[in-house]
Amino acid sequence: IMSNYNSVTPEFIDELKTLLGEKYVKTDADTLDRYKTDEEADERCFHLPDVVVIPADAEEIAGVVKLCNKYLIPLTVRGGGTGIVDGAIADKGGVVLLMERLNKIIELNKEGLYMVAQAGVRTLDIQAAAKAENLLYAGDPSSSDSCQIGGNLATNAGGIKAVRYGVTRNQVYAVQIVTPYGDIVDLGSPLKKCSTGYCMEQLVIGSEGTLGIITQVTLKLQPLPPYKIDMLAIFHDPMAAIGVVPQLVKAGIDPTSIEYMDNPNVRTTSEYLEFPGAPHVEDGIYVIITIETFNEDELDMKMEQASDICEAAGAVDVLEADERIWSMRRNCLESVSLISKVCTTDDVVVPVDEMSDMIQYIIKTVAKYPFPLRINAHIGDGN
């Protein structure tokens, strides 16, 4: 409740500057305006913070938390700002705390197959550091080029590889957090098996800052499959497109990704990215399938098997997908700006076997209203 908080005072600002240094305490109008929204940029949800702080480490974050408690000032933590549900917006004013200076990879253990990183490291940089050692960090949200690993944990982010490797919580050994009281606590450890007490690190993952501020993470790594193919299966019937998912899984193909774009998405993203030559742009529904293996013969076999399954299910074409196709998938949300300044985004998860029912329901329901509809999905995991 707003009345439980106090307004920011000059004394509070002065204490922040003493703690962090004047350079890292921002109250100018341009900075405050920059952090009034997240990726959705819905004007109805704009909220200006009173002050933006940029701490360097967990100790400074703990100090900020203690000061906010002392003065009863609301505190909002912001990672990459790529969310679309207002989680990084200071709806009660107060402090927005940026994680951008906590941007170091502390350790990459090739023998133990884990990485220790600060929470402000970009997910793309986590992936690149692992790949440089022929290892894989399997978390891969669509916004990996700009989101931060701490935000991935805070929201239990999914992504394009979840069908094979699981979501963010499946990639985490341990976390360090600053509690709401300003204590620094380490939870979990890089052990394959640990039956000592509760798995508190798993409780923190997905808690969206309500249990503490994630400052450091220990991530699982695994060998990087050397052989890979990206396939594009093109359908005209959305139910046929969705129907290939259980068939691919039951066939033992073990795809890394199965992504879905309806035709309105295909048309809008191709225009947004100036890619008029996108395959079947006028009528195609896209299913993007990634297969990765440790054996070239196995890759060839699974690729042929997947192609046969798609064609039998009604695919009008099965092609090799290049980076332009993946760019279309990653830009589904951004491309909506071509058709409307206002966009309502819903993120729905259902059991995989109910995916077709959900999409049919969405199409039928929205058809009652004069709104354009775009559907994209991680259909391999029901999201």
Model-derived segments and their meaning:
Residues 28-37, 223, 234, 242-383:
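C-terminal substrate-recognition/cap domain of FAD-linked oxidoreductases
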Residues 2-6, 51-54, 116, 165, ...:
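Hydrophobic alpha-helical scaffolding
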Residues 1-66, 83-113, 142, 265-276, ...:
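N-terminal flexible segment immediately upstream of the FAD-binding catalytic core
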Residues 74-77, 82-86:
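Active-site cofactor/substrate anionic-group-binding motifs, chiefly glycine-
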Residues 8-10, 14-25, 70-73, 128-135, ...:
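Generic secondary-structure signature for well-ordered alpha-helical cores
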Residues 104-259:
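FAD-binding subdomain of flavoenzyme oxidoreductases
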Residues 5-13, 54, 58-61, 119, ...:
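Generic structural signal for well-ordered, non-membrane alpha-helical segments
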